[in-house]
């Protein structure tokens, strides 16, 4: 208010012929913040995100026996301090056998819950919503960390038996992901579903407010859904509805265990990038089934079912935003867009043009945990709304 009076006093010294520029001068002097769709709040069920910027779930490979470490507090906490509205914890295994590597996160025991509680509490204290992605790696589990080659581990190297809808290895050249998965019987399917439910209950105890089911990138649930992998002839194979049965049954059980007032999200690979694989149209149909059983939002990624998708992914990630828009329009579900979203105006346009409800950033956030703050400045948005009080005081303008 004091600034306003000083501005008026200054303008009163202007000559009469300059009176017509007063409104423009007042607006300029007061530096009224711009309206931004990217920095508008979003309410989903009982939670409200302060903006539409989310941190994509990114494997860190830093857990010990599935237990989060100081690394995770730093990685996840810094993104909340940096201004993100949603911070999603990496693919978190529902069982020891569901991990990608021995260093992956887990939620199959209470020790893991206790390690996550201070992390989610800190994320909330900084104004962000903590989410977690629950996953089972399936035939892409029992691997070395990426910087160690990412190959399947033998038992002597600390590996474990893997499972899938069929007994086909991921790689057929016997070099990288060479292990043949155990063909899952109905009792194995039920066991994994129960593990997802138990992990969801632990996620709630750990303090998470958004839950994402990982059905993408060739991991277990996606491998059931994809005709490139699922060659079963029982009621879990064949038609799209049968191949979706594992995902749908698992989701129904999780929805019953996860509070109705909290959001439930599913990540889908919107295309397999391979002829004869899943298409965008297939996934839109799956999304309508998921909507009917209580899913609130779809996280739209792509690829990963087979080795043939590796090269296609690199050239097609930018198309995922359009897929999120198509799904959003056709299904009526909220969508998350992810993949090569790096620029502030790009993210603003995605939200403003109703292509997605949330943009998820991965590598951009690794490069710059303060990406949201810097984006706000670039877009002319008042930054203090997403900054801690000390930062507001010294660098908030």
Where are these regions (language model features)?
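Flavin-dependent oxidoreductase catalytic cores
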Residues: 30-397
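Hydrophobic alpha-helical signal peptides and transmembrane signal-/tail-anchor segments
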Residues: 1-4, 10
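Intrinsic-disorder-associated, low-complexity terminal segments enriched in Asp/Asn/His/Tyr and depleted
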Residues: 5-6, 17
């Amino acid at each position: 208010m004091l600034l306003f009076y000083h501005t008026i006093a200054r303008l009163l010294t202007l000559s009469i012929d300059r009176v017509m520029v007063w409104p423009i001068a007042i607006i300029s002097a007061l530096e009224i913040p711009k309206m931004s769709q990217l920095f508008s709040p979003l309410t989903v069920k009982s939670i409200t995100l302060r903006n539409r910027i989310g941190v994509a779930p990114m494997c860190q490979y830093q857990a010990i026996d599935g237990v989060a470490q100081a690394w995770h507090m730093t990685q996840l906490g810094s993104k909340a301090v940096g201004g993100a509205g949603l911070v999603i914890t990496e693919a978190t295994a529902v069982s020891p056998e569901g991990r990608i590597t021995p260093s992956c996160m887990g939620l199959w025991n209470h020790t893991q819950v206790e390690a996550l509680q201070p992390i989610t509490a800190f994320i909330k204290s900084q104004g962000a919503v903590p989410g977690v992605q629950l996953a089972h790696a399936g035939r892409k589990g029992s691997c070395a960390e990426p910087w160690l080659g990412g190959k399947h581990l033998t038992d002597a190297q600390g590996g474990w038996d893997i499972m899938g809808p069929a007994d086909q290895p991921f790689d057929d050249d016997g070099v990288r992901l060479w292990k043949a998965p155990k063909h899952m019987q109905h009792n194995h399917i039920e066991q994994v579903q129960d593990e997802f439910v138990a992990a969801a209950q632990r996620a709630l105890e750990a303090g998470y407010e958004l839950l994402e089911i990982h059905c993408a990138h060739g991991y277990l649930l996606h491998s059931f859904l994809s005709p490139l992998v699922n060659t079963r002839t029982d009621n879990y194979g064949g038609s799209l509805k049968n191949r979706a049965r594992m995902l749908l049954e698992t989701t129904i059980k999780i929805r019953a265990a996860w509070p109705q007032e909290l959001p439930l999200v599913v990540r889908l690979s919107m295309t397999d990038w391979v002829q004869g694989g899943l298409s965008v149209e297939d996934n839109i149909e799956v999304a309508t089934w998921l909507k009917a059983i209580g899913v609130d939002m779809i996280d739209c990624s792509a690829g990963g079912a087979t080795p043939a998708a590796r090269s296609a992914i690199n050239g097609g990630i930018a198309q995922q935003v359009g897929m999120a828009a198509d799904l959003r329009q056709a299904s009526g579900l909220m969508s998350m867009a992810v993949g090569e979203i790096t620029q502030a105006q790009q993210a603003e346009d995605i939200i403003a043009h109703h292509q997605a409800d949330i943009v998820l950033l991965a590598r951009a956030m690794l490069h710059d945990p303060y990406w949201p703050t810097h984006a706000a400045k670039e877009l002319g948005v008042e930054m203090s709304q997403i900054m801690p009080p000390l930062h507001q005081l010294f660098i908030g303008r």
